A protein has these predicted regions:
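Short glycine-rich phosphate-binding loop at a beta-alpha junction
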Residues: 72-80, 155, 208, 393-405
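Glycine-rich beta-strand-to-loop/alpha-helix junction loops that act as flexible
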Residues: 79-82, 212-213, 261-264, 400-408
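Small/polar loops that bind or transfer phosphate-bearing groups
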Residues: 11, 98, 102, 134, ...
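A conserved helix-loop-beta module that forms one wall/lid of the active-site cleft
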Residues: 196-212
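N-terminal glycine/serine-rich phosphate-binding loop of ATP-dependent small-molecule kinases
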Residues: 1-96, 124, 152, 224-234, ...
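Short beta-strand-loop/turn "lid" adjacent to the catalytic site in phosphate-handling enzymes
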Residues: 44, 68-102, 129-135, 160, ...
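Active-site core segments that coordinate phosphate-bearing ligands/cofactors
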Residues: 2, 8-9, 21, 107, ...
Length: 475
């Protein structure tokens, strides 16, 4: 690693995206944010679509800026959210904008699918928890409606691959993102075409699956020239953002659980093979593809969504609480005994989150500080419950919980979580998704041998904080 290598990660979320530049030099890894851009769905004729042109322009602005600064890139990688896709026409053009998973057009579709493929059979094949917006339900809904983009499509590309296509003109289907679609047989790690054909879904539009680390191709000649970067290769990283984040967990061995903490919390373990049985289905666990052939066995938990929605209510009331202020408020009511179930469907999309919580606890006299304390304690308790479930499935003893993502910066919640679960919580890195993206590019370039070397380098490069149970937390 004596030569300096530079990689660019585009990390795109459902509301915003950013680009981060990773530098490897002399065995040291560093990272800096290059740009940040909004990502908002478009509403057309009552439908929600992703604004692919806007995202592409943001990519181009970033690449052009790097080129003007004389920065030479070894490669580029892209990660995004899962399930959504775009259709490519036979002439290689975009057949239509990709629909956004927030569009309610798949409401009620799973029940229609189960009339053809029973729920238990679908889970047994794919290992994916049932959610209305899973790709399989989107494709069924579009097929049934005679969607013109899908009807004329020669291929479909999931969002990371679609964005890579805008830069390279090459079409691939990356494994980790495909694994979340609800269409992939988790045992064969290929699309279950027999199942899809029973639903009338076209299988000729599905591309062969490639593994993370596959080089997709160089930037298109006109983009290479326009940006001044030259023919930089674009690499298929772990395209699903959670897969990239889990790749960046700074663990020393397999005996860990992870919590990717943000608006939603994703808690799981990394295992060598899918865990698919009646217990995992009943508990609504999902199996998603990880790097190096691993499986991310996990559960979706409502995360900071509860607090974010309360903040919106309070802001409209003229109370603009900062996050540090919210932490102080919760700490001041640490002994407050009230609890809610964060995953209760009543909290999915209430008109007023504060009022919904008050109704749930049956006490409309709660102060704002007590509500915040209730949310934090309830999340910590829910993490304990799910961790206990995970231990029942894990082929090893879970010894620590790694918290990654934006929520890992919340020291009070980390401490209360450690107290609740009775084991150490290792917090950080915050930018796990982008770091995982960059590390997989470095692995593709031959700078890193495997995920454990990757994790050792991350551990040495980014500070983490360890929270042990029952420690003093009044700092």
């Amino acid at each position: 690693m004596n030569k300096t290598h530079r990689f660019l990660a585009f990390d795109c979320g459902a509301t915003s995206g950013r680009a981060l530049l990773g530098t490897f030099s002399g065995g040291v890894f560093s990272m800096e944010e290059v740009c940040r851009f909004p990502n908002r769905p478009l509403k057309r004729d009552g439908r929600l679509y992703w604004d692919l042109d806007s995202m592409r322009r943001s990519f181009m602005d970033c690449l052009t800026d790097l080129g003007s600064r004389g920065i030479k890139l070894d490669s580029i990688g892209i990660d995004t959210w899962g399930v959504d896709f775009g259709c490519i026409a036979p002439d290689g053009s975009l057949a239509g904008l990709p629909r956004a998973y927030r569009d309610p057009y798949t409401r009620g579709i799973p029940e229609e699918v189960f009339k053809i493929v029973p729920r238990t059979e679908l889970y047994a094949a794919t290992g994916i928890q049932i959610m209305d917006f899973n790709t399989i339900f989107q494709l069924y809904a579009q097929t049934r409606a005679g969607d013109p983009a899908l009807e004329k499509a020669a291929g479909i590309l999931f969002m990371p691959d679609l964005l890579a296509w805008t830069l390279t003109g090459r079409q691939v289907c990356e494994y980790t993102d495909a694994s979340t679609s609800g269409m992939m047989d988790q045992k064969t790690r290929s699309f279950d075409k027999g199942l899809l054909e029973r639903l009338g879904i076209r299988t000729d539009v599905l591309l062969p699956i490639v593994q993370p680390g596959t080089v997709i191709g160089p930037l298109k000649p006109q983009i290479a020239e326009q940006t001044g970067l030259g023919p930089v290769p674009v690499v298929a990283v772990a395209g699903h953002d959670t897969a990239s984040a889990v790749a960046a967990v700074p663990a020393a061995d397999e005996r860990f659980a992870y919590l990717s903490s943000g608006t939603w919390s994703l808690m799981g373990i990394e295992v060598p093979a899918p865990i698919i049985d009646s217990r995992s289905q009943a508990a609504n666990f999902t199996n998603e593809g990880g790097i190096e052939g691993t499986t991310r066995f996990l559960k979706n938990i409502t995360g900071m969504w509860l607090l974010e929605q309360c903040r919106e209510v309070w802001r409209k009331q003229g109370k603009d609480y900062s996050y540090p202020c919210l932490v102080r408020m919760a700490r001041s009511e640490e002994a407050f005994p009230g609890r809610i179930n964060p995953d209760d469907p009543r909290f999915a999309a209430p008109e007023n989150m504060v009022e919904e919580i008050l109704r749930c606890v049956q006490d409309d006299t709660l102060t704002d500080s007590q509500i915040v304390s209730c949310i934090y304690h309830s999340l910590a308790d829910r993490y304990r419950e799910v961790l206990g479930m995970l231990q029942g499935f894990a082929p090893f003893k879970i010894e620590k919980l790694h918290v990654i993502g934006g929520g890992s910066a919340n020291e009070l919640l980390n401490q209360w979580t450690a107290d609740a679960i009775g084991m150490p919580v290792v917090a950080g890195p915050v930018e796990a998704t982008a770091i995982g993206n960059l590390m997989l590019q470095a692995k593709a370039a031959g700078l890193i041998s495997d995920r454990w070397e990757m994790r050792r380098l991350i551990s040495a490069s980014f500070p983490v904080r360890v929270f042990t149970p029952h420690t003093i937390n009044n700092q």
